[in-house]
Amino acid sequence: MCGAIRYEVSARPITMFNCHCRDCQRTTVGAFTPVVYVPAKAFKITKGSPRYYSTPSEMVGHNRRGFCPECGSRLFGGETERGQGITASSLDDPSLFKPKVNMWISDAQPWDHMDPNLPKFEKYPPQR
């Protein structure tokens, strides 16, 4: 948001999704987190030093979320050996975000009105 932290991604996203898990609801203070999931090796911080906050997470075991120490914006989280989740609203052009699925709808709030055209999964989509 403020530009104190910058990152780049050198590969196409693995996928894009809306995560409705309780962890995402709490950290965004909203219904879900819009996530761009990219290959871990393609993600690089190019400016600044993010702060991190970690919590236990049913989704990834332990979720380490990076945020800007200046403005507090959540930037990324859910890092695994395979990939890195990036909060879509932190992209330079958030209109590039095109979610493929809604996941963890088992935790979705009753007031959360999801796009009826997107597939919905109680937890994770089946692995291909």
Language model features by range: what are they?
Residues 1-128:
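A short Gly-Trp-Pro
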